């Protein structure tokens, strides 16, 4: 209690010193009466206690409010009875913290103004009229110069101007500055006494205003790697038996918010990138990768159908959302492939190494995915030998018609093309590889997906 009373005495003395240094006596009387109340008060009540007219008290309070020395707030008073009306009162009070900031700012502006005046006295030469004693600066010389005589003449009385020595004015300025700061020394010392203290409120009822503004929140964003249960943001409310009331007037309420990682998204990206380097199918969409081939999809669809049948026999619920979700996704993918790969779907599966349009089952060399074998794409280098064609066609039922792509002088299956092989390809070889890749995807993935959907 002694420390709190001490800081109140320091702040009250500071306000009294500032008012007595820069304002008339009647202002000091109003401030002293306001300091004695230590609460928000109406101007008519303050006028009754000081025995001064209300309009005079309000005028002084408005002047002090313009200088940020006092503050006011509108408080709504509810009606007590059914026949009464609610009213709004204007209450006046002092904000200690705001006054400290205002006094520091005004002292800084005083010092800055005195320094600017001192610099102006040194840098700017002045001239004084001997007749009317008007003072001019060096900036006024062009309009004061007489072109006939070449002398400086006063623009008011045409008197002669003489150069004024700035030593006396500098001495007066320095003396005035020292006198000012000697008078303000007590205020500066009183300001230093407030440093290191917690500035209290002027009145207890002001605590309601700070509570209405809400407490300040501090969020502790500690990341968590686990997927365990999240701790409650309000530790006091975890148990009903140990729940307590949160004080809304508390200045700091700390919330512990655990931010989980992004569920291993970076790990999944790294795995897909590694598989693409091995298979060379980086340009395919994710749902057309070999890992999502029709064989795996058939196994997954069979397992899902078995699980759905078991759940339907055990319960009378509707089909699970997993089957519907897969069906919707596959329809979307089918429409996507139809629109983007319609050119390769409509093209005949023909073309050989010699440019003759033969069937894919013939003994000649076959190029999978060419748009017509009538000499339109004879410049393509993606060709097959007779022996390789026979071996590839013999394995067409098991391997899904694996296509050989030319990389320089070598022929490599399309599913084993790597990024290094793509870099070694020429422009024409890479174009042929792209056409063959999309043709391979549309034939081996789309057809089997469509058949599996039709069977379901």
From Swiss-Prot:
Designated name of the protein: General transcription factor IIE subunit 1
Protein function: Recruits TFIIH to the initiation complex and stimulates the RNA polymerase II C-terminal domain kinase and DNA-dependent ATPase activities of TFIIH. Both TFIIH and TFIIE are required for promoter clearance by RNA polymerase.
Segments of this protein annotated with the region Disordered: 345-402
Keyword Kinase among UniProt keywords: no
Organism expressing this protein natively: Dictyostelium discoideum
Biased composition (Basic and acidic residues): 377-386
Bias (Low complexity): 347-357
GO cellular component: transcription factor TFIIE complex
Record-annotated HTH TFE/IIEalpha-type domain positions: 11-100
Signal peptide: none
Family per similarity comment: Belongs to the TFIIE alpha subunit family.
Subcellular location: Nucleus
Keyword terms: Metal-binding, Nucleus, Transcription, Transcription regulation, Zinc, Zinc-finger
């Amino acid at each position: 209690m002694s420390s709190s009373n001490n800081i109140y005495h320091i702040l009250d003395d500071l306000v009294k010193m500032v008012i007595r240094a820069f304002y008339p006596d009647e202002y000091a009387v109003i401030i002293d009466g306001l300091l004695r109340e230590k609460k928000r008060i109406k101007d008519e009540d303050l006028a009754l206690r000081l025995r001064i007219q209300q309009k005079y008290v309000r005028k002084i309070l408005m002047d002090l409010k313009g200088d940020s020395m006092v503050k006011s707030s509108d408080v709504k008073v509810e009606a007590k009875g059914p026949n009464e009306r609610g009213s709004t009162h204007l209450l006046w009070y002092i904000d200690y913290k705001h006054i400290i900031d205002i006094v520091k700012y005004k002292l800084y502006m005083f010092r800055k103004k005195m320094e600017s005046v001192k610099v102006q006295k040194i840098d700017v030469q002045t001239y004084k009229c001997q007749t009317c004693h008007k003072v001019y600066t060096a900036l006024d010389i062009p309009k004061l110069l007489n072109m006939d005589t070449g002398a400086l003449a006063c623009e008011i009385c045409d008197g002669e101007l003489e150069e004024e020595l700035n030593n006396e004015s500098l001495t007066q300025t320095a003396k005035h500055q020292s006198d000012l700061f000697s008078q303000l020394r007590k205020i500066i010392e009183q300001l230093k006494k407030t440093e290191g203290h917690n500035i209290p409120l002027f009145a207890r009822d002001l605590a309601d205003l700070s509570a209405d503004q809400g407490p300040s929140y501090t969020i502790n964003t500690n990341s968590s790697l686990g997927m365990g249960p999240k701790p409650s943001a309000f530790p006091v409310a975890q148990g009903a038996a140990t729940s307590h009331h949160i004080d809304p007037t508390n200045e700091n309420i700390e919330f512990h918010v655990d931010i989980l990682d992004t569920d291993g998204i970076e790990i999944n990206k790294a795995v897909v990138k590694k598989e693409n380097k091995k298979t060379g199918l980086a340009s395919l969409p994710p749902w057309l990768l070999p890992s999502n081939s029709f064989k795996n999809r058939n196994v997954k669809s069979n397992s899902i159908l078995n699980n759905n049948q078991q759940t339907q026999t055990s319960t009378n619920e509707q089909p699970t959302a997993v089957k519907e979700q897969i069906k919707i996704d596959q329809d979307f993918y089918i429409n996507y492939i139809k629109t983007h790969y319609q050119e390769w779907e409509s093209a005949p599966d023909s073309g050989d190494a010699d440019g003759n349009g033969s069937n894919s089952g013939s003994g000649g060399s076959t190029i999978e995915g060419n748009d017509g074998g009538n000499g339109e794409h004879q410049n393509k280098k993606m060709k097959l030998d007779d022996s390789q064609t026979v071996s590839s066609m013999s394995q067409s039922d098991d391997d899904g018609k694996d296509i050989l792509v030319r990389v320089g002088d070598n022929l490599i299956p399309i599913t084993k093309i790597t990024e290094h092989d793509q870099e070694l390809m020429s422009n024409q070889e890479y174009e042929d590889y792209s056409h063959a890749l999309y043709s391979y995807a549309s034939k081996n993935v789309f057809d089997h997906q469509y058949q599996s959907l039709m069977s379901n």
